[in-house]
């Protein structure tokens, strides 16, 4: 199953990293630096310092790409 997690903060990043253990997971974040760090370093130091993310987790700043990718969307954004 292809999963997209919408949100690049604490909740979105934690859920995305956990889901990536079993599914093709793409995380959407607004901040291009957060996206770069997730993709290149497997970290999100702005929200989860000291925590290594799953190596298969990918991120994008392109909202449409995240939605097109998904069989399942998970919202991890503040309400």
Locate each region found by the language model:
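Rossmann-like NAD(P)-binding element
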Residues: 51-79
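NAD(P)+-binding Rossmann beta1-loop-alpha1 motif at the extreme N-terminus of oxidoreductases
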Residues: 1-49, 58-61
């Amino acid at each position: 199953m292809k999963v997209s997690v919408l949100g690049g903060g604490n909740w979105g990043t934690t859920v995305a990293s956990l889901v990536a253990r079993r599914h093709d997971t793409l995380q959407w974040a607004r901040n291009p630096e957060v996206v770069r760090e997730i993709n290149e370093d497997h970290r999100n130091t702005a929200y989860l310092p000291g925590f290594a993310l799953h190596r298969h987790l990918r991120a994008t700043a392109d909202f449409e790409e995240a939605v097109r990718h998904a069989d399942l969307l998970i919202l991890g954004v503040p309400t």
